[in-house]
Amino acid sequence: MTLKLGVNIDHVATLRNARKEAFPDPLDAAAICLAAGADFIVVHLRKDQRHIELKDVAQLCKWFPKKIHVECAATDFAQKAVLKYKPHSVCIVPEVPGEVTTTGGLKFTPAVEKRIFAMIEKLHKKHILVSLFVDPVPADLSAAARL
């Protein structure tokens, strides 16, 4: 297996949004990172779109096909977005309203597993690679493996 470099550009969008301007542009940041040798670009699409926005995901996937990795929750909002814009890969992560950053892995319950399984099936039908953000504990690893 070859090690690959992914660069997260979320905070380029955070700065843009704080300025209430069109710059810095995450699309420009992605181009610079890829030109400098990054293998792929990572963005976290949250429901509140506090940094990366739907328009960013759309543009990134359009201009850099096969180079975009989206982190998102197993929500209708995120699922519709990734099925529409078709990034190369998706990591399903937990999302807690008001959290500053993701602090732990998915919490597996039967309902969560069912929802994630359904999302994985839909993503695979669009040839989108899927990973899960899990805590390194046996029960969570087993749950992820079942999916």
Residue ranges and their predicted role:
Residues 1-77, 83-87, 143-146:
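Conserved N-terminal beta1-alpha1 strand-loop-helix module at the mouth
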Residues 77-79, 84-147:
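Conserved anion-binding
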